[in-house]
């Protein structure tokens, strides 16, 4: 029984990995059908549906992976780092680096892969970005408590500016067919970003 469960879990992971790879390829800029996905995995469409009731559920699983990866690591940064500037820099690098290492999933983050799918999926991505923005805002607000001095600019505005930078770099990555990596020149860009944090 345990072997059967492991085999089923492995097949599910194989399906999700194939979907992510298809999103990374030129197929990712078009609607991905279950027929194409089944052919990529080497199974029938019926076999796909034994593991996932719908393609939407496959995207849900990929979004869960994105959420877990980003939120868990952001929480680790917040636990380990106390300096506000370092926290912000590491969170931004995390988002950009995750996108760079997972180009297919970046198409999901930017919404490109979800254009032909259910609106609910885009809503989940919107919620993820709202959670990240809320965490950035909290880091900015905690500066006053941690370092004795806050920002003169509204933390809401600063948090949205930081997240907009990340979203823009991810969008540029997808638009360029993954040519312009999100972390390229980040060390040179950071002082420009940090200068806005007043």
Curated annotation (Swiss-Prot):
Q: Which molecular function term from Gene Ontology is one that the record holds?
A: DNA-binding transcription factor activity
One record GO biological process:
cell division
Can you give the residue ranges of the HTH tetR-type domain? 10-70
One Pfam family from the record: SlmA-like_C
The UniProt annotation gives the DNA-binding region as 33-52
The answer to keyword Metal-binding applying to this record is no
Q: Which PROSITE patterns does the entry mention?
A: HTH_TETR_1, HTH_TETR_2
Cite a GO CC annotation. Answer: cytoplasm
Keywords associated with the record: Cell cycle, Cell division, Coiled coil, Cytoplasm, DNA-binding
**InterPro entries noted in UniProt:** DNA-bd_HTH_TetR-type_CS, Homeodomain-like_sf, HTH-type_TetR-like_transc_reg, HTH_TetR, NO_SlmA, SlmA-like_C, Tet_transcr_reg_TetR-rel_C_sf
Please state where this protein is localized.
Cytoplasm, Nucleoid
Give coiled-coil spans as residue ranges: 117-144
Q: Where primarily located?
A: cytoplasm
Q: How does it assemble?
A: Homodimer. Interacts with FtsZ.
Main function: Required for nucleoid occlusion (NO) phenomenon, which prevents Z-ring formation and cell division over the nucleoid. Acts as a DNA-associated cell division inhibitor that binds simultaneously chromosomal DNA and FtsZ, and disrupts the assembly of FtsZ polymers. SlmA-DNA-binding sequences (SBS) are dispersed on non-Ter regions of the chromosome, preventing FtsZ polymerization at these regions.
- HAMAP family given for it? NO_factor_SlmA (MF_01839)
Protein family membership:
Belongs to the nucleoid occlusion factor SlmA family.
Q: What is this protein called?
A: Nucleoid occlusion factor SlmA
Give the species this sequence originates from: Salmonella dublin (strain CT_02021853)
Q: Which gene is transcribed and translated to give this protein?
A: slmA
